[in-house]
Amino acid sequence: MTALFQQLPSVDKILKTSQGLQLITEFGHTAVVATCRELLTQARQFIKKNNQLPEYFSNFDRTFVEIHSRLQKQNQVQIKAVHNLTGTVLHTNLGRALWSEAAQQAALSVMQKNVSLEYDLDKGKRSHRDNYISELLCKLTGAEAACIVNNNAAAVLLMLATFAQGKEVIISRGELIEIGGAFRIPDIMEQAGCYLVEVGTTNRTHLKDYRNAITENTAFLMKVHSSNYQICGFTSSVSEEELAELGREMNVPVVTDLGSGALIDLSQYGLPKESTVQEKVAQGVGLVSFSGDKLLGGVQAGIIVGKKEWIEQLQAHPLKRALRCDKVILAGLEATLRLYLNPEKLTEKLPTLYLLTQPLKQLKINAMRLKERLESRLNSQFDIQIEASQAQIGSGSQPMERIPSVAVTIAEKTNVKLSALSARFKQLSQPIIGRMENGKIWLDLRSLAAIETLLNTLDEL
């Protein structure tokens, strides 16, 4: 075993070779030294365990191939582009909404230049970074003003911290939601320093329940969109319009966490109906919060629209600065919102809406091409079929609704396991992410952004 240890080169010897000098030129001295030390440590452990040299130390060329490979991997960004074939268009784990071309160009432009982020070009003095988008949102929603933060949970936190600290917030028991990552509405309220007052029951809440709970310490009445679940059967709830009327009568503000935040009626495209921001504003809700990267189809942001005097108080709260968005997000959001000024072109310009409205005929064509490519690459190892599928919007939007789709399914036919194929899919330069269902891999075309790129990726199999 001692002889094996002696065969290992020193770090200095590796660095002084021509290959070592090339590595230093490409990756830098510090990174190369660290990788060499790591490799040698692992080699010593391997020798102790197996009483032989690892393969990559069998000759110098293989050693340098291994070092180069590790250094390349270290330099790669770990957030990788993937092919979404899960059938969930707004997949939280895969980054939710794809940015439009307009949003990408706007973001790239502000990355490369100094911009008028907080500067009024007409007046020649400082302005507020939310101003551009606030004007646009008012035009689109009918609200008086708007406030932008980094996500919808932050929007809810800011509203609670600004108006309800040390006070009571009345909410229906059926709306005490938990979203992904065990993040709960009651927890946000606790962080904001307000007191939760639950009214009604899980399945039935009436207007009188809110009325009876109002006290002099009530900050506001709150509605929360139950985006990731539905209560069915013997149910009753109070609409925002009814609640707003009660709020005006009792001089208590009403706020709504709308969650997904649609700016258009999706039913016009044959999709499930979702409440729009405009509807809530028109119903008299004082503040409406929603996400920028769900049904809106843009960047991750929390958007609050509503009455000007309340928005001004949100903007003045110290927490707003901690939650504000940078120039890239604001540019991407503005560009996304401007697409809504021409709604007739939305299905062409907005990737989320394009994916959700793709005709089945096109999905079938894409499925046939995908099936042919898989069959040519997998050499009859699996049973590959085209089947009808049921896709979903995702990110908590209409959780019980499904959208007709088409999928390529892969089932075992030989001794090659699906788990092995799934692992191979994930090792590709742009990994393929499908779903396992009924003993098959389902590759759902509804959520796929680029068929040509996928087919090229499959050539690596």
From Swiss-Prot:
Coiled coil: none
Catalytic activity annotation: L-seryl-tRNA(Sec) + selenophosphate + H(+) = L-selenocysteinyl-tRNA(Sec) + phosphate
Localization per Swiss-Prot or TrEMBL: Cytoplasm
Signal peptide (residue range): none
The UniProt record lists the keyword Disulfide bond: no
Sequence positions bearing N6-(pyridoxal phosphate)lysine: K294
BP-aspect Gene Ontology terms: conversion of seryl-tRNAsec to selenocys-tRNAsec; selenocysteine incorporation
Pfam families reported in the protein's UniProt record: Se-cys_synth_N, SelA
Keyword terms, alphabetized: Cytoplasm, Protein biosynthesis, Pyridoxal phosphate, Selenium, Transferase
GO molecular-function terms, A-Z: L-seryl-tRNA(Sec) selenium transferase activity
Pathway as given in its UniProt record: Aminoacyl-tRNA biosynthesis; selenocysteinyl-tRNA(Sec) biosynthesis; selenocysteinyl-tRNA(Sec) from L-seryl-tRNA(Sec) (bacterial route): step 1/1
E.C. no: 2.9.1.1
Protein's job: Converts seryl-tRNA(Sec) to selenocysteinyl-tRNA(Sec) required for selenoprotein biosynthesis.
Family classification: Belongs to the SelA family.
Name the UniProt record assigns to this protein: L-seryl-tRNA(Sec) selenium transferase
Species of provenance: Haemophilus influenzae (strain 86-028NP)
Name of encoding gene: selA
